[in-house]
């Protein structure tokens, strides 16, 4: 069973990381379009074209299901891709529903942080319209955070100063929920935790999309008896280039280690 996981950059490793925990039997191909990151500052048409190329690449590699581990790509391209390709394509979306539901206990607000494309997109608007009947959700675009992540700059003073500047119009004590609406943002949970109240709950779509992936491949018969108990594998591609050198794999290992630390926050 071969599964493709796509993102504009290294953010999607957080989805891969969770998928490997949820379904360790799978053989994964992770594709990060690092030559064209960040997607959140491009037009929807540009994003759609880039994602179409990456999905075609994964299909050619024999993937039987594909996860768009990118909120921006999901928002801009998933409907088009599902019409074009016959295999299951699973998207990720900001976890607005559980965050809003939790505010019934806390009586406070929800902040959704995302890229500009996701923030302005119809998909997020529909989610908020559907679940935010008490109007407790605020959306903040953090485009530079993707660039920080791609530069391995996770906890510098530049990151802290940027977040403080973007959050300056808001009283952060008003928020009990922070929805991470971009997979790159999982690398910065420690930075968010320093700025928000101690009881802040950070939610992302990683567990939900991993469970959805598992349910889909079981239902479609992609996961078969021969996959049970099997030890899976991972191949990594950066914009069509396979990552194989010792230095490249060492760097990817470090990113997984950071994501595991952030998962514990």
UniProtKB/Swiss-Prot annotation:
It is an enzyme of class 5 (isomerase). InterPro entries: Asp/Glu/hydantoin_racemase, Asp/Glu_race, Asp/Glu_racemase_AS_1, Glu_race. It comes from the Bacteria. Substrate binds at residues 7-8, 39-40, 71-72, 183-184. Keywords: Cell shape, Cell wall biogenesis/degradation, Isomerase, Peptidoglycan synthesis. GO terms for molecular function: glutamate racemase activity. The keyword Magnesium does not apply. Gene3D superfamilies: 3.40.50.1860. Its EC number is 5.1.1.3. The active site is at 70 (proton donor/acceptor), 182 (proton donor/acceptor). HAMAP family: Glu_racemase. Belongs to the aspartate/glutamate racemases family. Provides the (R)-glutamate required for cell wall biosynthesis. This is Glutamate racemase. It comes from Lachnospira eligens (strain ATCC 27750 / DSM 3376 / VPI C15-48 / C15-B4).
């Amino acid at each position: 069973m071969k599964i493709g996981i796509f993102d504009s950059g290294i953010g999607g490793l957080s989805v891969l990381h969770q998928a490997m925990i949820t379904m360790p039997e799978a053989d994964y191909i992770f594709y990060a379009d690092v030559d064209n990151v960040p997607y959140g500052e491009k037009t929807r048409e540009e994003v759609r074209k880039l994602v179409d190329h990456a999905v075609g690449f994964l299909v050619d590699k024999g993937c039987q299901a594909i996860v768009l581990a990118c909120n921006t790509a999901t928002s801009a391209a998933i409907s088009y891709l599902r019409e074009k390709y016959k295999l299951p394509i699973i998207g990720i979306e900001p976890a607005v529903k559980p965050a809003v539901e939790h505010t019934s206990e806390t009586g406070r607000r929800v902040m959704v942080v995302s890229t500009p494309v996701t923030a302005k997109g119809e998909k997020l608007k529909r989610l908020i319209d559907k679940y935010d009947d008490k109007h407790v959700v605020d959306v903040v675009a953090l485009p530079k955070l993707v660039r920080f992540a791609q530069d391995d700059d996770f906890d510098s003073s530049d990151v802290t100063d940027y977040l403080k500047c973007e959050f300056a119009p808001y009283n952060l004590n008003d928020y009990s929920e922070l929805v991470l609406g971009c997979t790159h943002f999982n690398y910065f949970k420690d930075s968010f935790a320093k700025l928000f109240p101690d009881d802040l709950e950070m939610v992302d779509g990683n567990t939900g999309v991993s469970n959805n992936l598992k349910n889909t491949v079981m239902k479609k018969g992609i996961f078969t008896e021969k996959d049970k108990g099997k030890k899976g594998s991972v191949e990594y591609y950066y914009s069509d280039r396979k990552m194989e050198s010792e230095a490249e794999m060492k760097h990817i290992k470090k990113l997984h280690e950071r994501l595991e630390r952030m998962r514990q926050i």
